Amino acid sequence: MALTYYRTYAQAIAKVQETADVTRAVAQSVNGGQGVIVVRDLTAQDLGAQAVAIPPGNFTVTIASGVVPSGKAFGIYGFELTTPFVRIANGNLVGLVLDTYVGGSRVKRVYLDVVNDSSETGLTYYIADKSIVMKQQIQYSFVLSGVNNTGSTITLMVNVLGFVGEPSGVTIIEQ
């Protein structure tokens, strides 16, 4: 069986660099090879991601969805379940699955249960096989499903780890 995920950033560093390089190449291609392309970290704002309320029992929630903006490319190398951290090991959340859809088709299914490291800092899943790279005008969505056994609603945030390739000077960060 082929390895599908890495446990640590140190193990994943080559895949992370490969994702950055491919994201840059795709962004260069969608911009007709013109201008300087920069690669920066993908943010929740890029994806429209936000914390979601996980109801008790079986659930399916959309973490983020949208369309890759013109002139840009998104490259994804991992996912991180962040605060407030709920210990999966204690059975609070089971069957936790994150599906990634690109252009309406599921391209990646991640079983977040398998990366339970019993820490209080969160769960991180680094993709070991093929990274997900999306070019401009491609529709995407990230859908989380599973079972919440806590008896109450939990608020969770799933960070999508990746890069944005774009022409230099496109992004303006508001202070």
Region roles according to the model:
Residues 1-175:
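Beta-strand-centric surfaces of beta-sandwich/beta-rich domains
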